[in-house]
Amino acid sequence: MIDNTKIRSLLEEGLTVFQLDSIGDLLLDFLLLLNKWNKTYNLTAIRDIETMVSKHLFDSLAILPWIKGNHIIDVGTGPGLPGIPLAIAKPDLQFVLLDSNGKKISFLNEVKRQLNIKNIEPIQIRVENYHPNQGFDTVISRAFSSLEQMIKWTQHLVAQDGLWLAMKGRFPDTELVPIHQTYRVERYAVPGIEGERCCVLINNTNKE
């Protein structure tokens, strides 16, 4: 039995930190839908809904300050993480949610329908086979094992003056060694999560 009151309280407490108090109801609806589908389709390894609040919702929202532009893609989005929380927080931005897993894209289409989220476009395709008409301002992912692999497989997606945003745990010293583009690393804290979190911002320009 899910204690909606407790979940709502956890959400409100964290959203106050992000100054996003107004989106609590929609995030809760997303979380409950994710929890329901997860029992059948194994969309995420996290089963505890309270843990989902911090590790899925808050971790996604924490990268908001570094998103660039209006045209965003979340590569390997899975069940819409971080794409759905970001789209809820920023309804004026457009998000493509890319994944090759049909069950996850079916879930995202249901999220779009039930929650009436108009600024997302779930697409089922492998990243190397996706060729949009224009590049994206920000390419987000937490799905790649290394920064080098992320750039390799998504180079064709980023706009000329665009940005890669990779979500990481510990500071990725060794992953940064082969990166030829200019970059910076931003550390951040997530309510309810202990330990280091950071995101790597990589510009689509080579180091001089």
From Swiss-Prot:
It comes from Legionella pneumophila (strain Lens). Keywords: Cytoplasm, Methyltransferase, rRNA processing, S-adenosyl-L-methionine, Transferase. One of its GO terms (molecular function) is rRNA (guanine-N7-)-methyltransferase activity. S-adenosyl-L-methionine binds at G76, L81, V127, E128, R142. Gene3D superfamilies: Vaccinia Virus protein VP39. It is found in: Cytoplasm. Specifically methylates the N7 position of guanine in position 527 of 16S rRNA. The keyword Heme does not apply. This is Ribosomal RNA small subunit methyltransferase G. Belongs to the methyltransferase superfamily. RNA methyltransferase RsmG family.
